[in-house]
Amino acid sequence: MKKLFVALILAALPLLSFAAEHGGPELEKVDIDVSDKAAMQDGLRTFTNYCMGCHSAKFQRYERVADDLGIPHEVMLSHSVFTGAKIGDHMSIGMQPADAKTWFGAAPPDLTLVARVRGTDWLYNYLKSFYEDPARPYGVNNKVFPNVGMPNVLVGLQGRQVVGCKQVQVVEDGKKQYDPLTGTPLTHEACDQLTILPKTGTLNEEQFDEKVKNLVTFLAYSANPVKLQHQRIGTYVLLYLAFFFVFAYLLKREYWKDVH
């Protein structure tokens, strides 16, 4: 038995080594709230305007999304449906997979479940990490997904981003450092950093971060549209169990009072 256990440990070492070497960059955490309908509505707007030219959400229906996000059906059809689809149709696109493979080398993936597959932190950082790279076919690369095979569709909002040197705040043990006397942030020059060229995008950095966060919030909802319903039902179940426990305890005392 001991030999088998040792053999399993040794067999797992190459996998652990691979995971350590290919873990990717450290991801900035993002707080996603799928109960925020305003954020999801803005995310839907960004998704339909910037993503649905190539990516579908074919496991969702326009009607279900409209109802969940509190959008009237006529508004959904006029602002988020550009293909002549009906309110009960799936959120598909007109591009055929065979054509997409010919044009791009591979068909763009469906994004209905991408937040479940990749995670919200990964999506948030990926969408903010495109930078100019003339050596790539679309002129851009990505810090989170090196040699990415898609263009930066949000460049008009974010602006042109390049890799260079800039002053960044000192971080020790995961905490940002400040001057103890003045309270100003302590900085140092770091290279291989992403920098947005001034006045090349329609949004400032804070606005763009919020726009991406809202898009990721919508994708998180799309990946699990019944999450809030499950949480609500779970609350009722726990309340029922707590209520039932009181009567179960009283019944137990009644059964055992003669024994004790």
Predicted regions and their residues:
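The canonical Cys-X-X-Cys-His
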Residues: 47-58, 215
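Stable alpha-helical elements in mature extracytoplasmic
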Residues: 36-39, 46-47, 107, 119-123, ...
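Sec-dependent signal peptide recognition
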Residues: 2-9
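Electrostatic cytochrome c docking/interface patches
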Residues: 20-45, 56-67, 223-231
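N-terminal signal peptide c-region/cleavage motif recognized by signal peptidases
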Residues: 14-17
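Short, aromatic-rich amphipathic segments at membrane interfaces
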Residues: 197-234
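Juxtamembrane interface at the cytosolic side of transmembrane helices
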Residues: 230-260
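Electron-transfer interface patches adjacent to heme c in soluble/periplasmic c-type cytochromes
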Residues: 70-143, 148-182, 189, 193-208
